[in-house]
A protein has these predicted regions:
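Short, glycine/acidic-rich hinge or "gate" loops at secondary-structure transitions
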Residues: 157-165
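Flexible, charged surface loops at secondary-structure boundaries
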Residues: 28-32, 72-78, 302-303
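N-terminal helicase ATP-binding lobe
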Residues: 164-317
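Generic beta-sheet signal
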Residues: 35, 78-80, 305-309
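Conserved DEDDh/DEDDy metal-dependent 3′-5′ exonuclease domain
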Residues: 53-129, 133-154
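Short, flexible loop/turn motifs enriched in small residues
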Residues: 44-51
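N-terminal accessory regions of nucleic-acid-interacting proteins
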Residues: 1-33, 105
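Two-metal-ion RNase H-like nuclease active-site motif
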Residues: 33-43
Length: 317
């Protein structure tokens, strides 16, 4: 049987790797895998296909402008991968035709698997950083390298976290193909309990998770991915917020809405006195004629109330 170049990115490189245009992705533990990576160049004014590049699992390369000739090249392929393939490349390549492949989109995976600043070296906003302009084969190579890193990062996650994100993202078309590629089976789990356990101390313990799980599973996944970061300058990419505007609302619910009962997270992270000490080094807020104006303004801000704070001279602006 011919060796399949898609594999585990952690495995050792074999002697044939240098001659294979598709770098070994790791002996794939879920069995033989037939895949291709595709990229399409579209004209800015005529919105027509100007060039197509594709890399196949057996090392074959396709570089033509004919989508009709691409189809025989993909004949034995099971997984069709690319960067923004679902809502861009596939739309131009196959139009309304039924797609027989499982689509794996590296774009939607990147903010989930690499949410930490400085993010992934191959991605800027929603674009791949390419070495060559208007070369779809080169873009396929970059998409392949990004996919490799995404596979390795997924494998490096703790099993409980993988189970949690699988439960949230199964049946989401932008991610489902990747989960299938990684053999991520859906197991019975109490998602609310899983999230509360994995993110204990990093989100409000009393937040109502059930409505978020039911109505915003994808947005919740992006929010949790950002919460996992340790660099406070890490942000959700603008294109994610454009496609999933509820991400900001969910982060506010999880992290910036103090619960009435009080919990470990809210009592420590949303306490204005603790923050005053940790951020500014002061033990107490300044008062003005006995009135704690600073404290009231800070508390109103933490509670998300609309406010306009006007301090008199000497009042602690």
């Amino acid at each position: 049987m011919q060796e399949n170049p898609i594999s585990n990115s952690l495995s050792k490189t074999d002697s044939n790797e240098a001659s294979n245009p598709i770098r070994s992705l790791m002996p794939f533990r879920y069995g033989p895998l037939c895949y291709a990576i595709v990229d399409v160049e579209i004209g800015l004014t005529d919105h027509r296909i100007h060039d197509i590049g594709a890399l196949r699992y057996d090392g074959a390369i396709f570089h033509k402008a004919s989508k009709e000739e691409l189809l025989p090249f993909l004949e034995r392929v099971e997984y069709l991968c690319g960067h923004n393939i679902i809502h861009h490349d596939a739309k131009y390549l196959f139009e309304d035709r039924q797609i027989p492949w499982r689509l794996v989109d590296t774009l939607y995976l990147s903010p989930l698997l690499f949410p930490e600043r400085p993010y992934h070296r191959l991605v800027k906003d929603d674009k791949l950083l390419s070495d060559q302009m208007n070369n779809p084969v080169n873009d396929c190579e970059k998409a392949r390298d990004l996919l490799l890193d995404e596979m390795a990062r997924w494998d490096a996650w703790p099993e409980q976290k993988r189970r949690l994100f699988t439960a949230l993202l199964r049946d989401q078309p932008e991610v489902d193909g990747f989960l299938d590629l990684m053999g991520a089976g859906l197991k019975n789990c109490d998602l609310r309990e899983q999230i509360a356990t994995v993110y204990r101390g990093r989100i409000c313990q009393n937040v109502e998770l059930e409505p978020l799980i039911e109505h915003y599973p994808c947005e919740l996944a992006y929010a949790l991915a950002l919460i996992d970061t340790t660099d406070h300058r890490s942000i959700t990419p603008g294109w994610v917020l454009h496609n999933y505007p509820s991400v900001e609302f969910i982060i506010k619910k999880l992290r910036y809405t103090p619960c009435l009962a009080g919990c470990t997270y809210c009592n420590s992270q949303l306490d204005v006195h603790r923050s005053l000490k940790s951020l500014f080094g002061y033990n107490a807020f300044r008062t003005y004629e006995g009135e704690p104006l600073q404290e009231r303004a800070a508390q109103a801000a933490v509670e998300g109330r609309s406010l306009l704070a006007i301090f008199p001279t000497g009042g602690g602006k």
